[in-house]
Structure formats: structure tokens, C-alpha cells
Amino acid sequence: MNEQCDLPATPLSPHRPLDEFYAAPAARQEFVNELFDEAAPDYDWVSGMMSFWSDRFYRKDGLWKAGLRSGMKLLDVASGTGLMISAALELGVDPAQVTGVDPSQGMLAQNRERNPKTVTLLEGKGESLPCADSTFNFVSMGYALRHVEDLRKLFGEFHRVLRPGGRVLILEITRPKSVVALHLMRFYMQKLVPRIGWLRRRNKSTAKLMQYYWATIAECVPPAVILSALEASGFKNVKRTTTGAVLSEYVAER
């Protein structure tokens, strides 16, 4: 699907300021970091629950279809608890050739527990990656596009750290077009998953995380804007495919 649109040259947030969660846009990053720090111990369970436990297969399949192979140097942005990295390792990627970047110390702690010590994990934001130019063959991002501040800066950084011919894969959840599907998805994410999470761990952060997750999905810019921003950042062969109407895979080449 190639539904790009023209964009003005200004900072491009993935969604409006969500003032029901933080007082001002400047407070957004601190809120997000704190939210993920608190929810980190339960994040893998939440991810599995939201996807009916298909998330691990979907990540691995997406990476393979986008062209990730052994011998490549991988950067996983907004790496979280390391689920994308684990999927890459299952495909034969050398752990010593993998770098993960995330702004949440809590998520990085979970990541370190999951993956080999030879994986490099760095604290940092996608819009200002702590990585040298033209370093990686592949950049991945799993379900974190909605949590950055500026898509243009993010994609510019992707382009900067990739080698010529390098590839990008962005996995994301997209707001369903069907009204029925929209209501079902809202109920599942805002009511059912938080309730089960509370019964399971008594962690209030799980409910808060799901409320925020849903808000970012409901308010996220449409796919056409994301595709156009990738093209404007210098990427070619930009495309989007979907699974089940709500799971989007954005791929592009440097």
C-alpha cells in the first residue's frame, strides 16, 4: 500500500498532546519513561495478552519478511524488554552484532535479563540515537512509533545510522476502520486486559499502561502520514502491509 501524502516541514508528532495523561507536551517524555519503568515487569505478559500470544511469531515473521538475515548488524530502537531482539536471535543474528536503544531503565533491565550479555544495550531516544553514522544493515522498531516525539527526527536518525542499502522495519498497531472492530478493540484493551492484569499481579501500572496505549492508537496519525515521512527522510521502496486490519508493517530501504 502506497498512500503517501504531502507534509509541511515542521515537527511531526505521532499524535496530539494527550493532556489527560501529562500536563504539557514538555512533560511527555518523563511521563512515558516513568510509565514504562513501572510497567516493565508486566510488559511481556501485556504484549502477549494483547496479541492472543501471537506476538513472538509475528515479530520473527516480520523481521524475516523484511530481509533480516544472519551476518547483518541490527539496531533495535525503543527496544523495551527485548522481544524484537530475541526474535532476531532466533533468525540466526549474532548477539554481538545487535544493539538495542531505549529511554526506559526499567525496560532495559528486563532486556538484559532476557538476552545474551554480548548484546549491546544503550539508554537513549530514537530521535537522538547514540550511534555512529552508517553503522547498521537493519533497523527495527516494534510497537513504539506512537511513543516518540517527532517522526521526522526519528526517521532522519534511522537514515543516518543505516548503511547504504540498509532496511527498516516498523511494526505498529493501527486504529481499525470498522466501527464494530474499534469498539471491540477499545473494550479489550481498556477494560478486559487491565482487569485480568490486576487480578494477576495487582499492578496498577498495567491498567495505566493500557489506557495510554489505547489513547495513542486512537489518536495516531494515519498510515499515509507515516509513509510520507519515511519518503521525505530519504528512504526508498517505502511500503506498508497489514495483518488482521490492525497490524501494520512498514518497510523501507536507505
Write out the residue ranges for each language-model feature.
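C-terminal alpha-helical "lid/dimerization" subdomain adjacent to the S-adenosyl-L-methionine
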Residues: 101, 175-229, 233, 239
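Conserved alpha-helix/loop element of class I SAM-dependent methyltransferases that forms part
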Residues: 52-72, 87
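A short acidic, Gly/Pro-enriched loop at the edge of an enzyme's catalytic core
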Residues: 127-138
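Core SAM-dependent methyltransferase catalytic element
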Residues: 233-254
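Class I SAM-dependent methyltransferase SAM/SAH-binding core
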Residues: 73-128
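Conserved beta-strand signature within the Rossmann-like core of class I S-adenosyl-L-methionine
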Residues: 166-173
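A short glycine-rich, Lys/Arg-flanked "PGG" loop and its adjoining helix->strand segment in the class I
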Residues: 152-164
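A short SAM/SAH-binding and catalytic strip from SAM-dependent methyltransferases
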Residues: 137-151
